[in-house]
Every structure is written in C-alpha cells, then in structure tokens.
C-alpha cells in the first residue's frame, strides 16, 4: 500500500482547516495517510483528524530558531526513515523546512 505524509506546524489551525479533503482523496484511492504536526488544541484529547490513519505529534514551533525544532527534526527524521513514505506533502514555513531537511537523504 502506498503511503503519504502531510507535514505542517499545527493540526487545528492548519491541517483541519485546509487538508481534510486531500486526506480523504488519498484514502479513497487506497493510500495509507499520516499527519505530522503539533497538537494545538486546548484539550489535546480533542485532536481527532478525519481520514488520517496515523498521527504523529511533533513539537514544531513557529519560530525557526526555537530549540524545540531540533527535537522536531529528530523525531520527524526517525519517522521518515522508518515509514518509507511515497509522498511527503509539506506545508507551513517551519514544518516544510524541517520536513525537507529530514527527508533530504531519504529520497
């Protein structure tokens, strides 16, 4: 089965607002869908992403120089190396930069 990973800095204010139709489209085509983003819900248990098979809570920060982004890079790189995604769909400036760096040697 083919696998797609959507990467953005946050879930509630980005993934949920813009990418649900694309997650559904990939699932309808038989793909396994995954999302990597920080859970920005006030109550973390409210984070339920429709049409997402696997969710990775990555500690992205919106400011690129924050130390948490180093941890986010390491976590995302481990996920990409382990899961072998066919497509990595990058969004938001910091999330996209970290995803591209994490996937650089994988491609």
Residue ranges and their predicted role:
Residues 3-5, 104-107:
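Active-site proximal beta-strand in glycosyltransferases
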Residues 6, 89-90:
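Short beta-strand scaffold positions
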Residues 5-68:
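N-terminal strand-loop element at the rim of the active site
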Residues 3, 86-87:
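Structural motif
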Residues 79-86:
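Glycine-rich phosphate-binding loop signature in dinucleotide/nucleotide-binding domains
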């Amino acid at each position: 089965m083919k696998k797609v990973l959507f990467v953005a800095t946050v879930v509630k204010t980005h993934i949920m607002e813009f990418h649900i139709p694309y997650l559904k489209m990939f699932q309808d085509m038989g793909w396994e869908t995954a999302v990597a983003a920080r859970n920005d819900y006030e109550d973390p248990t409210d984070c339920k992403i429709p049409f997402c098979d696997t969710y990775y809570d990555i500690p992205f920060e919106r400011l690129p120089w924050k130390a948490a982004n180093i941890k986010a890079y390491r976590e995302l790189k481990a996920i990409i190396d382990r899961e072998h995604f066919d497509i990595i769909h990058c969004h938001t400036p910091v999330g996209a930069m970290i995803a591209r760096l994490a996937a650089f040697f994988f491609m």
